[in-house]
A protein has these predicted regions:
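Alpha-helical interface subdomain recognition
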Residues: 1-143
Length: 143
C-alpha cells in the first residue's frame, strides 16, 4: 500500500472539518473512529512490510509463506482502501474533477485496483489451498 495515500488521507483529515456529524467544526482527524481507521491501516501496512521482508530474505521461509503474504497483502489492500474511503466520506467516490471530490478520487481508484489483486497472481482461494497443504498438512479440496 502506498504510504503516500495513507499520508494524503491523514493530511486531509487533519485539515478538514466535520460539517454535521459529531461535533460540527471539529477536525475530522479528532474523531476517535477516524484515528482507529488510520491506525489500523498503518499497523497492518507495517506488518505486511515485515512479512514481505521475511519472505524476500529467505532463510527459514516455508513453502506456503509466499501464499500467506499474497493472501494477507491483497485482502489487506482492499480493507485498507475501504477504511480510508470511510474517513474521506462521500467525496471519496466522487469522480476526479467533479465538485465535492476528495484527493482527486485516488483512494477510490486504488480500492478498485486492489480488488483485482485478489485473483491476479493466483486466486486467493487457490493460495489458501497451497497454505492448507504446505503449511498445515491438509488435503487440497477438489474443485
Amino acid at each position: 500500500m502506498a504510504r503516500a495515500r495513507l499520508a494524503g488521507v491523514r493530511d486531509w483529515a487533519a485539515s478538514a472539518k466535520l460539517a454535521s456529524a459529531g461535533k460540527p467544526g471539529q477536525r475530522v482527524i479528532d474523531a476517535e473512529w477516524v484515528q482507529l481507521n488510520l491506525a489500523r491501516v498503518h499497523a497492518k501496512a507495517e506488518f505486511l512490510k515485515l512479512l514481505n521482508w521475511r519472505v524476500a530474505a529467505g532463510g527459514s521461509v516455508g513453502p506456503a509463506d509466499a501464499s500467506v503474504t499474497k493472501v494477507f497483502g491483497t485482502e489487506f489492500a482492499v480493507e485498507a482502501y475501504r477504511l480510508l474511503m470511510e474517513v474521506l466520506g462521500a467525496g471519496a467516490v466522487v469522480r476526479s474533477g467533479s465538485a465535492g471530490e476528495v484527493l482527486a478520487g485516488r483512494i477510490e481508484r486504488a480500492h478498485r485496483a486492489a480488488l483485482i489483486l485478489t485473483f491476479g497472481g493466483g486466486t486467493n482461494e487457490v493460495q489458501r489451498d497451497i497454505i492448507a497443504a504446505a503449511a498445515l498438512g491438509l488435503s487440497i479440496r477438489r474443485r
